[in-house]
Amino acid sequence: MKIHEYQGKEILRKFGVAVPRGKPAFSVDEAVKVAQELGGPVWVVKAQIHAGGRGKGGGVKVAKSLEQVREYSNQILGMQLKTHQTGPEGQKVNRLLIEEGADIKKELYVGIVIDRVSQKVVVMASSEGGMDIEEVAEKTPEAIHKVAVEPSVGLQDAEADDLAKKIGVPDASIPQAREILKGLYKSFWETDASLAEINPLVLTGDGKVIALDAKFNFDSNALFRHPEIVAYRDLDEEDPAEIEASKFDLAYISLDGNIGCLVNGAGLAMATMDTIKLFGGEPANFLDVGGGATTEKVTEAFKLMLKNPGLKAILVNIFGGIMRCDVIAEGVIAGSKAVNLNVPLVVRMKGTNEDLGKKMLAESGLPIISADSMEEAAQKVVAAAAGK
């Protein structure tokens, strides 16, 4: 689950991280009112969407008068903001963050993720903060410094100080940077985040260290422990199909291709998409029906995939372990009939009650294309999507 920048800053404040004064605004008049409350002479008008690259996309403006606050708010609010993370369609801006300006002397970067190889939380920092951190990571990875934190003790003062020095924080500002790094780590740990990022972390002209941005992603499996985080959820920022899928315990992610995938198990789902790509196709979605796929779930899965106007074919790839193949076959047949399936359907099933499941599909009277291996299934669905 993702949240907005202003919500991330609310979390950072709770953990002692210095952030600029600011408030969200949902209308132009409210934006001007917030600016008046903050006082000038400089304000920043920031689009609030669940995507990075807002500055390059025209979603962040520096205003030097209340008239400019109104002008920029009017420009940004309601716009379809396009960034490298939104896709070509962009994302509509429904809210703004109005905050006080800062005298920026130097932009830095700090971020925290989980390294599954070392099984530790890794704190990253770079002296090359700002809008092009992705380019820094790609072209000069040595500019990003890392420390793997021992979970039982957390981020230590010496580790935080060492990171701060490596990214060029002056000695006089090291204590401030230490508090920010430790506060960011604590916020990451205590909220069950999967990503916590400040970009940029800035050094100001008067020697202060301030988090000028905040980005959090949270582990959806841990949200039951954090109702205060769930309250931050903005459904306007989420894919309607993914929201609908969550109601039926379906793990669904929309993609840009034209071949729908219905699979049980995340690993098999990813392998299925890779195999489709291998044979020249493009997956339209990731869809894991899990180990308890009922007829209702399969039907809803078909409905979700068919909402994609670019869908050309569907591949059902099932390994019958806990889930029996005959149950899946029953769901596929019922689901196909319920939605009047009008695209080619390729089904590959292996495992428990495999023969029975195949027999049910063969006798269903539906134009289902069967396959014995994942490679054969992928080749057949790619050909079907191409109209061959």
Curated annotation (Swiss-Prot):
Top-level class of the enzyme under EC nomenclature: ligase
Enzyme Commission identifier(s): 6.2.1.5
Listed cofactors: Mg(2+)
Molecular function GO terms recorded: ATP binding; magnesium ion binding; succinate-CoA ligase (ADP-forming) activity; succinate-CoA ligase (GDP-forming) activity
Cofactor binding description: Binds 1 Mg(2+) ion per subunit.
Chain positions recorded as substrate binding sites: N264, G321, I322, M323
Keywords assigned by UniProt, alphabetized: ATP-binding, Ligase, Magnesium, Metal-binding, Nucleotide-binding, Tricarboxylic acid cycle
Pathway noted in the entry: Carbohydrate metabolism; tricarboxylic acid cycle; succinate from succinyl-CoA (ligase route): step 1/1
Keyword Coiled coil: no
Residue positions binding Mg(2+): N199, D213
Binding sites annotated in the UniProt record for ATP: K46, G53, R54, G55, E99, A102, E107
Domain ATP-grasp positions: 9-244
KW Ligase (keyword) present: yes
A biological process from GO: tricarboxylic acid cycle
NCBIfam families: PRK00696.1, sucCoAbeta
Function summary: Succinyl-CoA synthetase functions in the citric acid cycle (TCA), coupling the hydrolysis of succinyl-CoA to the synthesis of either ATP or GTP and thus represents the only step of substrate-level phosphorylation in the TCA. The beta subunit provides nucleotide specificity of the enzyme and binds the substrate succinate, while the binding sites for coenzyme A and phosphate are found in the alpha subunit.
Subunit structure: Heterotetramer of two alpha and two beta subunits.
Family, per entry: Belongs to the succinate/malate CoA ligase beta subunit family.
Descriptive protein name: Succinate--CoA ligase [ADP-forming] subunit beta
Organism encoding this protein: Burkholderia mallei (strain ATCC 23344)
